[in-house]
Amino acid sequence: MLTTTIIAGIISFILTILAMPFFIRFYQLKKINGQQMHEDVKQHLAKAGTPTMGGTVFLLVAALVTFICAFVLHITGGPAFGATLAILFIVLIYGTIGFLDDFLKIFKKINQGLTAWQKMALQLIGGLVFYLVHVKPSGTDSLNLFGFPLHLGVFYIIFILFWVVGFSNAVNLTDGIDGLASISVVISLLTYSVIAYVQNQFDVLLIIISMVGALLGFFVYNHKPAKVFMGDVGSLALGAMLAAISITLRQEWTLLIIGIVYVLETASVMLQVSYFKWTKKRKGEGQRIFRMTPFHHHLELGGLRLRESGKKWSEWQVDFFLWSIGLLGSLLILAILYL
């Protein structure tokens, strides 16, 4: 089982590396207008036109490798892979939502893609189906908090929807500079691979390692200067995948710390908007806490200082800083669980 899982990761890595140049070349040959830039970070303007929707490639590779390996293992006497298929299902559902959003922006020239309400409705439907086909049959209606069950009853459905939709959008916000989201998710997935291994949930481990391999292959083309971006098709799917894995492993709360980067990025946006509206109402003029949100843009424009102007950070500096925070959060969780 473990050997097959490792092989799956290696195959995903190789296939993604081999397939991505054809995807990029397709963009160039068809003269498709890629990523649009409407940001105040001037150094990002040079990225306009970079091929996007690269998540289509690594999602399909990871899904194909996972499905084939799960099928082969099952017919050769291995366990059932219900959890694998459930997680794969929500990955593809959210990937499809992201694909539709990207497609409308890039090919139909609809700047906003799906409206916020359309996207939210589709995400909620995807989360609800995941609950009905995977969570509800298990009879679970409680959160596992340090080994103690917190029974939520009917509110557990609301939690599932909030968790999946919330982290899907959180990873989407994180995907704002070259390589940040891809390696942040790799760190999170590797942490959950340890938890899955300890729990002997090799069905979950299989899809985790397959996706890690595909993401590392994608990073070869996504690190600065990026030759391709993952797009909403990739980021929405990855966020939903992390939420689904945490639910399946009964370690939901750990995602708040393992995914501290996504939480920080989302919190910065919420704080910025709330504070701006509050100060505008109180003082007649909106004020900001951060130079720009999500948080990675704040770092780019002047480092950690809030209102004072500091030295601008390069994308690599921002990447390594936030990757380090994600790694520390992951190590903290493993220490809490197993030391």
UniProtKB/Swiss-Prot annotation:
Keyword Transmembrane: yes
Enzyme Commission number(s) from the entry: 2.7.8.13
Keyword Transferase assigned: yes
Domain of life: Bacteria
PROSITE patterns with a match to the protein in the record: MRAY_2
Signal peptide limits: none
Pathway where it operates: Cell wall biogenesis; peptidoglycan biosynthesis
Catalytic reactions on record: UDP-N-acetyl-alpha-D-muramoyl-L-alanyl-gamma-D-glutamyl-L-lysyl-D-alanyl-D-alanine + di-trans,octa-cis-undecaprenyl phosphate = Mur2Ac(oyl-L-Ala-gamma-D-Glu-L-Lys-D-Ala-D-Ala)-di-trans,octa-cis-undecaprenyl diphosphate + UMP
Cofactor(s) the record lists: Mg(2+)
Protein topology in the membrane: Multi-pass membrane protein
Cellular component aspect of the GO annotation: plasma membrane
Molecular function as annotated in GO: metal ion binding; phospho-N-acetylmuramoyl-pentapeptide-transferase activity
GO biological process terms, semicolon-separated: cell division; cell wall organization; peptidoglycan biosynthetic process; regulation of cell shape
Keywords from the UniProt entry: Cell cycle, Cell division, Cell membrane, Cell shape, Cell wall biogenesis/degradation, Magnesium, Membrane, Metal-binding, Peptidoglycan synthesis, Transferase, Transmembrane, Transmembrane helix
PANTHER family in the record: PHOSPHO-N-ACETYLMURAMOYL-PENTAPEPTIDE-TRANSFERASE, PHOSPHO-N-ACETYLMURAMOYL-PENTAPEPTIDE-TRANSFERASE HOMOLOG
Function: Catalyzes the initial step of the lipid cycle reactions in the biosynthesis of the cell wall peptidoglycan: transfers peptidoglycan precursor phospho-MurNAc-pentapeptide from UDP-MurNAc-pentapeptide onto the lipid carrier undecaprenyl phosphate, yielding undecaprenyl-pyrophosphoryl-MurNAc-pentapeptide, known as lipid I.
Entry similarity comment: Belongs to the glycosyltransferase 4 family. MraY subfamily.
Protein name as it appears in the record: Phospho-N-acetylmuramoyl-pentapeptide-transferase
Organism: Streptococcus mutans serotype c (strain ATCC 700610 / UA159)
